[in-house]
Amino acid sequence: MEPTDQILIVVAMEAEALPIRRKLGLDGHGLQLSDHSSARIWRNDSICLVTNGINPRFGVDSIGTIPAALTTFSAIKAVEPQIVISAGTCGGFKKRDGSIGEIVIAERCFFHDHRISLGGFEEYGVGNFPVLDLGAVAKRLGFRTGSVST
């Protein structure tokens, strides 16, 4: 499959995705991303949006690192986008000046409370994954940059 010019937006929860879908004109129930998951996909000529879908056992949105990784991997494989945007709601820390409704652009991304106290596994446990440098974009739009953990 040839890479596309599409942008992939990954959102965990339907309630987070709905306003984005409305704004982008991505209507309907979407399509099932794969036979092995409940993830849903909507697309137009330039944007592809996926959600993790509903957990069949508990009947709630599939949230967390495992559904996010599986959905993102499957969507990247299916779409081969030029860029992936992980968007949605997350917690913040008031002591770090976080506030409800604030947009924060990631300058680093790591696992929250995922420490492994075995020699040589400390860095692996934390993750500290690279992200695209969007500092200039954040400044231009008036958004803050900061660390994002999952």
Question: What are the functions of these language-model segments?
Answer:
Residues 3-5, 34-150:
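Glycine-rich phosphate- or other oxyanion-binding loops that anchor nucleotides, phosphorylated ligands
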